């Protein structure tokens, strides 16, 4: 893969807490009281409509499920996941019982919810039935986002600003063992991160990593070996915070957010070819 090329920018506005694509449309989640989800055409990047998530109080991530044609939005304020039907606009929610952070959908079309503070990954059906949960190893501090691999293990990015380890790890399916890692002590060298914030994975199990405070996106092999930085700091004005990979169109959507005065104050989505 070559270094990504910027092909479009969506309008800047409120901070972006999630970006996902579904059925030829791109969905962007912003912190607002209404019309929180902006829907764009993936070809023209033209705004098509906006969707409201009723009863939402906060946001930490968004993902989508092609099988169920819906969006999932994690709400850390009321500790729940919102499910939004993109066809009819019907919205339901279910309790997570811990503060939810990153979201992903596995091959069984179930939702994986990463719970940072308790180091757990919880699996739910599309109707919110609790299926199982995995407690991560002690050294996987502050997990932010997790994706299940084809072998059943979990790719997890972890480590906040002040944590001694900031890495991407492959964890066994039962959560007991850390099998492989990339990263370590925080820093800006090739094999370091300053908050490995969010992940995306392609059909060959190659891993894209949003390196928030280094303003770059790393590409790792399926064994978590470093390949290259597909996006570098020169291509960002703010920190890359969320990722969405559209492998069929060879597009990587990156939400970048601006931090100032102790909080996120603005955000937008950049569109790259890869």
What do the predicted segments below correspond to?
Residues 45-76, 90-91:
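Blade-loop segments of beta-propeller domains
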Residues 41-45, 85-89, 124-129, 172-174, ...:
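Short loop/turn segments that connect beta-strands within beta-propeller blades
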Residues 1-14, 43-46:
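A short helix->beta-strand "capping" segment at the edge of beta-propeller domains
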Residues 238-274:
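Blade-level signature of beta-propeller repeat domains, shared across WD40, Kelch, NHL, RCC1
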Residues 34-38, 79-82, 119-122, 163-169, ...:
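Structural motif
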Residues 12-23, 54-69, 96-111, 137-160, ...:
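Beta-rich, blade/repeat-based domains predominating
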Residues 7-8, 48-52, 92-96, 132-136, ...:
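Beta-propeller fold detector
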Residues 28-33, 65, 71-77, 113-118, ...:
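Conserved beta-strand positions in repeat-built beta-propeller and related beta-rich domains
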């Amino acid at each position: 893969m070559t270094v990504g090329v910027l092909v479009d920018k969506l309008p800047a506005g409120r901070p972006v807490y999630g970006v996902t694509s579904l059925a030829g449309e791109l969905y962007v989640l912003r912190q607002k009281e209404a019309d929180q989800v902006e829907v764009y055409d993936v070809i023209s990047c033209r705004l098509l409509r906006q969707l409201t998530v009723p009863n939402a109080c906060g946001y930490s991530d968004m993902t989508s499920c092609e099988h169920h044609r819906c969006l999932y939005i994690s709400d850390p304020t009321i500790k729940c996941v919102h499910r939004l039907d993109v066809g009819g606009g019907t919205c339901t929610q279910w309790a997570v019982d811990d503060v939810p952070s990153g979201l992903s959908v596995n091959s069984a079309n179930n939702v994986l919810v990463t719970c940072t503070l308790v180091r757990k990954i919880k699996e739910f059906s599309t109707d919110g039935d609790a299926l199982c949960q995995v407690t991560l190893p002690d050294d996987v501090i502050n997990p932010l986002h997790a994706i299940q691999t084809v072998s059943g293990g979990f790719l997890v990015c972890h480590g906040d600003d002040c944590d001694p380890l900031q890495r991407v790890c492959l964890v066994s399916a039962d959560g007991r063992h850390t099998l492989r890692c990339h990263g370590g002590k925080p820093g800006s060298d090739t094999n370091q991160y300053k908050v490995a914030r969010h992940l995306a994975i392609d059909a060959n199990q190659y891993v894209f990593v949003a390196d928030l405070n280094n303003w770059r996106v790393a590409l790792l092999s399926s064994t978590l070996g470093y390949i290259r930085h597909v996006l570098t700091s020169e291509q960002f004005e703010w920190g890359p915070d969320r990722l969405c990979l559209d492998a069929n169109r060879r597009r990587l959507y990156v939400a970048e957010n601006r931090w100032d005065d102790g909080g996120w104050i603005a955000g937008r989505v950049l569109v790259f070819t890869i």
